[in-house]
UniProtKB/Swiss-Prot annotation:
Polar residues: bias regions: 27-42
Family stated for the protein in its record: Belongs to the GAGE family.
Name the UniProt record assigns to this protein: P antigen family member 5
Keywords of this entry: Phosphoprotein
Region entry Disordered, spans: 1-88, 101-130
Superkingdom of the organism of origin: Eukaryota
InterPro entries: GAGE, GAGE_fam
SMART domains linked: GAGE
Residues with Phosphothreonine modification: T113, T116
UniProt KW Transmembrane keyword: no
Biased composition, class Basic and acidic residues, residue ranges: 14-26
Keyword presence, Phosphoprotein: yes
Signal peptide stretch: none
Length: 130
């Protein structure tokens, strides 16, 4: 006798049939482990409850607003700014790095249009030759 779910992908079955199948799977898996006890894992869907907004606010530590002025501007207390010719040199070096690291053709590739390849002409030319 063929199982009711075999060959029918849309079969949902009754709750009892689904529960029975789940118990069968749980028992067969536990017996494969050499464990005759029922699995302590729940059979069926598990619903994870998300914390409510009030609980999230209680759990989150207060954020530290260092570096942000009351006006909303961010204070720059990090590394000193690069000025003058150093900026230009840095930009040139960065541009060179981007060019060198860019994927694609190397310096030995010539620009131009490649000839088109027609496989039917190749076959015609090679038909009489062995």
């Amino acid at each position: 006798m063929q199982a009711p779910w075999a060959g029918n992908r849309g079969w949902a079955g009754t709750r009892e049939e689904v529960r029975d199948m789940s118990e069968h799977v749980t028992r067969s898996q536990s017996s494969e482990r050499g464990n005759d006890q029922e699995s302590s894992q729940p059979v069926g869907p598990v619903i994870v409850q998300q914390p409510t907004e009030e609980k999230r606010q209680e759990e989150e530590p207060p954020t530290d607003n260092q570096g942000i002025a009351p006006s909303g501007e961010i204070k720059n207390e990090g590394a000193p700014a690069v000025q003058g010719t150093d900026v230009e040199a840095f930009q040139q070096e960065l541009a060179l790095l981007k060019i060198e690291d860019a994927p694609g053709d190397g310096p030995d590739v010539r620009e131009g249009t490649l000839p088109t390849f027609d496989p039917t002409k190749v076959l015609e030319a090679g038909e009489g030759q062995l």
